[in-house]
Amino acid sequence: MKHRCFEPYDALTVGEAMFVKEEILPQFIGDQGYFSTIFAFEPCHAYRKGKNYMDYDWPQPFDDWKKETFHNQKIIEKAGFEANIIENHDQPRGASLFIPEEDYGFYSLSALAMIMLCQRGLPFLYQGQEIGMSNRRWEYAEFNDLETINQYHIAREAGMSEEQALKIASHHSRDNARTPMQWNHDENAGFSTEKPWMPVNENYKIVNVKDEEKEYGSILNFYKRLIAFRKSGEYNEILTYGDFKPMYEEEYHIFAYSRSYGDQKLVLICNFSSEEKSVELLEDYESVVFVNYEQTTVIGNRLQMKPYECVVYEKR
């Protein structure tokens, strides 16, 4: 199929393939693979500790997420490029899965965006991710997804109360990613004048495209700046083709890695937590090239990081 359908048109194909072993990755991606790339599901699924919702962690455990990301980056590098994601139509919203509810906001959302878009690979954004769409609060009768309904009953049969089962189902339901896009303040978030197939998230008057387009400090406009940074002439090649190397692997709630290409090097350091952190800088860096706060603070050789601060340094 690849040779007859895709190659004549130089088509980019993306496969849904999970837990592909390192030794057979070249069969799936790259010049000789079935597809151009496959989605990087493993880091997003690090919270799944069993077969049922009630076995899953919530929110996503930081160490498991970081470990899976670093592992994926290591094994994929020789085979080709993976399609990096934070969320998709079969998962809860990344803004809720990766970020504790009390920490939801611009800095946590922008840190999550930087961690993903600066990795090696092909970044995919899912509709609504760019404005920070999150999970909604559900009543049992509102669920549309059969998996969610089944998981609710599995939790009840295991002895959980209605409230507990509903909470678990609400966290993990795929319906969270399938609510209508939030365009503006109008009825049904501007998606349709007719009743949509499922309820709109109640936060649509706060989280919507129209408001965020007008606000420079919105997560939507941050995504635009971050994408422009990745595509810029100065950094496009290193962020596309550069080697990926994990850093600060033992530092809890510090997500860091370097990208190297020729004589150019970038280092991303992120404090993915609600507490301030002090991080030792392992090298002298020439400049800060991207950050989600207005400024960074360095005292001696230590970076004093604010909650959810994420910074990209350059070293030549």
Where are the regions a protein language model picked out?
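Active-site and adjacent substrate-binding regions of carbohydrate-active enzymes
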Residues: M1-E286, V291-R316
